[in-house]
Each structure stands twice: as structure tokens, then as C-alpha cells.
Regions:
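Flexible, glycine-rich surface segments
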Residues: 193, 198-199, 208-238
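Acidic (Asp/Glu) and glycine-rich low-complexity loops/linkers
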Residues: 21-47, 52-161, 172, 178, ...
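C-terminal/domain-terminus segments
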Residues: 297-307
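Bacterial N-terminal signal peptides that target proteins for export
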Residues: 1-9
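Right-handed parallel beta-helix
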Residues: 161-201
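Beta-strand-rich extracellular passenger or scaffold domains
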Residues: 158, 168, 205-206, 226-228, ...
Length: 307
């Protein structure tokens, strides 16, 4: 298999390929990047500190990335939060707490760029790196919000994260999806793989065409509703919890008794006997299957059957 390390900054792309659109007042940068082995499903990892991410599946084999800066600049408080978070991540990596995959990728990037000078972008700071069918996409969004619009082959797996000022939207993707937001909604439609979706302030809305068999999934938020639509024939064990909301479904969910999650007996030492019952409501759909977990604090849960 051919191995490649593909590293781009927008300035470099401009010099060699001419595929960048640039507006001084409202920058917009674009890059088209192939996977090392386009015959196999790839993986895209993208992160934005301030802004949103939209990913759409299409019939092509390359990843098309566009970064669009918003006209409204961020407040000084937003900038300080983003800078502090980035510094914390870099400090953790410097202390050797990065996962092995990150360390390996960092070593490969360093070797490839040995003796070369990094040219920083003066636009959205769009950076795309590709190693062994894994593509990493990031932007500089400290002083103004930047939105990422990405087109990927249908079977691409995704790992996406955002923090402020934007939603994450995914359409027509069949790979595995892990998506995290902090202040924004998650909106997934036409997906047909495994989904792990989490946000803090925002709704989680997912519409499945089909689900991967025997794979667990999780959907969670703190302030918001969870609304997930599944094919009618899914088989699953479901665990559902809403502290300050209700749970609704048009599936025939067979509820199960919730066993104690903890039993503690300290009576011999003069203490107490304590039983703690789990807060989740559990049940099965169509006889049961992999575990699907739904968890919100301030919001309702809707588990829908596709019509």
C-alpha cells in the first residue's frame, strides 16, 4: 500500500494549485485533498474552536474542504477561552499524555517536515494533513468565527468537535461517526453507521437510514432534547435517562426492571446498609440487541420509528 503524508497550509496551496478563493473582508479558503488509498474508506478528523462544521457525503473520492470566516469578530472573552483551551492541550501533549496514535502522527509529520519552515496562513488558517487515509482538518478561529464545509466520500468515518458559536451538521455519511460539541446543536440526517454524539448546550437530532449491526451507540446532552429516528426493524437494548424531562417513543419498548447499581453493607462496622437503584430506564426493541444509550438533564427524549 502506498503511504503518504499530505500537509497543506492555505498559503502553500495558493502558490502551487490556485484553488483558493480569498476575500480580504470575509476570507474563504478551499482545498481538495485525496486520500492515500482512495479504494478504502478513509477517516476525517476536524475541529473548530469558534464556528460550526457541516459535512456532506458525495460520490467523489476526494475530500473537498472550505473554510469560511464570518464577518462578526469574536469578543475578547471568546478569544481568551479558545487560547486557554489550546494551551492546555499542547501542555498535555508536551508532558507525554497524548494517545499513541497522536504521538505516531506527530513523529511522522516532524520527519516529513524536517529542515523546512512552516508558512503560516494569513486567511482562515485552514490546515489539512493526511497520513495513511486519516485526514486532519483545522482552522485558526480565535479572533473570528470560522465555519468548515466539508464534502467526503459516502463511506468516510468522522471525528468532529466544536466548542462555540456553531452547530455540527452531517448529511448522507455511512461511516462511523463520533461528534462532540459544547455550545451548539448536533444535526445528523441520512446516516447509516455507528454514532456517538455528545453536546452540552444544544439539541441532538439524528435520522438513520440504517444502523450497523451489533454496534453500541450513545446520544447525550445536558441542556437540550434528544430526537433520534431509527429504521422500524432495529434490534436494540435501550437505556434512557432524563432528569428534568420526559421520554417518548412509538416503538414497542419492552421495559425491564432496573437492578441495583450498588449495594453497600457497613452495618458490622456500625454503619448503614445502602442500596442504590440506577436512574436509567431500560428496555428492549424487537427482542433486544446492542446497547443504545440516551442521556439528557434538561430536555426530553424522543425515540422514533421511521415511517
Amino acid at each position: 500500500m502506498r503511504k503518504a503524508c499530505f500537509f497543506l497550509t492555505i498559503v502553500t496551496i495558493f502558490l502551487f494549485s490556485g484553488i483558493i478563493a480569498f476575500s480580504q473582508e470575509n476570507p474563504s479558503d478551499k482545498a481538495t485533498v485525496p486520500f492515500s488509498n482512495p479504494s478504502k474508506p478513509g477517516r476525517v478528523e476536524a475541529s473548530v474552536h469558534n464556528g460550526g462544521i457541516t459535512v456532506k457525503g458525495y460520490e467523489g473520492k476526494e475530500v473537498i474542504v472550505e473554510a469560511r470566516a464570518r464577518e462578526k469578530k469574536l469578543s475578547e472573552e471568546d478569544v481568551n477561552v479558545a487560547v486557554a483551551q489550546r494551551a492546555a492541550r499542547e501542555a498535555a501533549r508536551a508532558l507525554g499524555r497524548a494517545v499513541p496514535e497522536e504521538k505516531k502522527k506527530a513523529e511522522e509529520k516532524a520527519a516529513k517536515a524536517a529542515g523546512m519552515r512552516l508558512i503560516q496562513s494569513v486567511t482562515t488558517g485552514l490546515t489539512v494533513e493526511e497520513v495513511n487515509n486519516v485526514m486532519d482538518i483545522s482552522v485558526e478561529s480565535f479572533k473570528r468565527a470560522v465555519d468548515l464545509i466539508i464534502q467526503v466520500p459516502y463511506s468516510t468515518s468522522l471525528e468532529l468537535s466544536a466548542f462555540n458559536n456553531g452547530d455540527i451538521v452531517i448529511e448522507n455519511v455511512s461511516g462511523e461517526i463520533e461528534v462532540n460539541n459544547h455550545n451548539g446543536a448536533l444535526k445528523l440526517s441520512g446516516v447509516s453507521g455507528v454514532v456517538v454524539a455528545s453536546t452540552f448546550n444544544g439539541d441532538v437530532t439524528v435520522n438513520f437510514i440504517k444502523v450497523a449491526p451489533e454496534k453500541p451507540m450513545s446520544f447525550s446532552t445536558w441542556n437540550g432534547d434528544i430526537d433520534v429516528t431509527f429504521p422500524a426493524d432495529i434490534k436494540a437494548n435501550v437505556k434512557m435517562k432524563s432528569q428534568r424531562g420526559d421520554i417518548y417513543s412509538d416503538f414497542d419498548i419492552k421495559l425491564m426492571a432496573t437492578p441495583p447499581s450498588a449495594v453497600e453493607d457497613k452495618r458490622k462496622e456500625g454503619g448503614k446498609y445502602r442500596i442504590s437503584i440506577g436512574e436509567y430506564t431500560s428496555g428492549t426493541i424487537n427482542g433486544g440487541g446492542p446497547e443504545f444509550q440516551f442521556n439528557t438533564f434538561n430536555g426530553n427524549i424522543f425515540i422514533r420509528k421511521a415511517k
